[in-house]
Design a protein with these regions (language model features):
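Active-site-proximal loop/helix segments of hydrolase catalytic cores
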Residues: 124-125, 202-265
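Binuclear metal-ion centers of metallo-dependent hydrolases, dominated by the metallo-beta-lactamase
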Residues: 175-194, 210, 263-316
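Short, conserved loop/helix-junction motifs that constitute active-site signature segments
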Residues: 132-133, 153-160, 240-243, 261-266
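Active-site environment of divalent metal-dependent phosphoester hydrolases
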Residues: 127-128, 144-148, 170-172, 189, ...
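Divalent metal-coordination and catalytic microenvironments
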Residues: 112, 142, 196, 230, ...
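Metallo-beta-lactamase
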Residues: 2, 7-105, 111-130, 135-137, ...
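Short hydrophobic/aromatic beta-strand or adjacent loop that forms the aromatic wall/cage
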Residues: 107-109, 186, 211-215
Length: 316
């Protein structure tokens, strides 16, 4: 299949679901769900996205974050379109059962809607603060700038809405009164209809990366959702207590042994994020096409039913 540029843009913005990938959670037939794309189309899109994002350097992305000017770069236009799409669909979508609606915004940032709640995980976007009036709470896995937005966190605090993070203070916004997750000790709490278990995982094997990331294991009725941030080590810390997740949101790079990780978690399905993080240089935190395909292959061999979360995708 050879997609034209016009067909490519149409495919990422409005592709109808073609087949259910998940066991235990069916894809919404009206959703542009990454989990429901054919492998052939996903493969084409990976190549196209890789090509389009390579032209955006961290410096260009940084200027866009300051002034909002996309400067004609397709990837930055796509980032704006993705945000508009997610905001519109989050307002319009009604969730009736336990299966939440989950959208990919950018990087490891997601919006989740349940019957009673709307919340974010690692939301990072130039306009993230404009979602605050809609959200009930927000989760942040760790204090790297590609996983949280300062203006968004300030706005959540000013709106007196819960911001759950692994750090109570940070040099970028000391005044934020976030809920601190204590040390490496797991914590379990409930916000509205979402029960949340936090546990520390290692971002890297080096000293700075030990216990650096807080993972979130969530119960939404009978649905199990897992977000592990930038977990980079598949050791005994990486484990679930509430059963195999219906959906695992993960970053398949850093130093993570994908095969070992999937054997430990055994998700019913998963979505790869953090693949085209424009603040990183290509191959230095920004995944290459080779890394993405290798991760997908390793996850598939481990029975993980992997899919790529493109910006703006509705995953569930």
């Amino acid at each position: 299949m050879d997609l034209s540029r016009r067909d490519f843009i149409t495919a990422i913005g409005g592709l109808a679901a073609t087949a259910a990938l998940a066991e235990g959670a069916d894809c919404d037939p009206s959703a542009s769900a990454s989990a429901c794309r054919s492998e052939e189309l996903q493969s084409e899109l990976i190549t196209k996205w890789n090509c389009e994002t390579e032209s955006v350097s961290p410096q260009v992305y940084g200027r866009y974050m300051l002034d909002g000017d996309t400067r004609g770069f397709w990837a930055l236009d796509a980032l704006e379109r993705a945000f508009e799409k997610v905001m519109r669909e989050a307002k319009e979508t009604t969730v009736a059962g336990d299966v939440p609606a989950v959208w990919s915004v950018y990087n490891m940032g997601y919006i989740v809607k349940t019957r009673e709640s709307l919340f974010s995980i690692d939301l990072k976007h130039r306009r993230a603060h404009s979602l605050v009036p809609l959200l009930d709470f927000a989760l942040v896995t760790h204090k790297h700038g590609d996983h949280y937005d300062v203006n968004f966190c300030k706005a959540m605090d000013e709106a007196d809405k819960p911001l759950v993070s692994s750090f109570a203070e940070n040099a970028a916004f000391d005044e934020i009164k976030a809920k601190a997750v204590a040390g490496g000790k797991p914590d379990v709490f409930k916000i509205r209809d979402v029960e949340i278990r936090t546990f520390r995982v290692d971002h890297a094997k080096e000293a700075w990366g030990i216990d650096f990331t807080t993972a979130f294991e969530m119960k939404i009725g009978k649905f199990r959702l897992l977000h592990t941030g930038d977990c980079g080590v598949a050791n005994d810390k990486l484990r679930v207590e509430w059963g195999h997740p219906d959906l695992w949101l993960l970053f398949p790079m850093t130093s993570l042994d994908v095969t070992d990780a999937f054997k430990r978690i055994r998700p019913k399905r998963c979505a790869f994020g953090h693949l085209w993080e424009l603040g990183h240089a290509v191959g230095k935190g920004r995944a290459t096409e080779w890394h993405i395909r290798r991760g997908l292959d390793m996850a598939a061999r481990a029975g993980g039913k992997p899919a790529v979360a493109f910006w703006g995708d509705r995953i569930c």
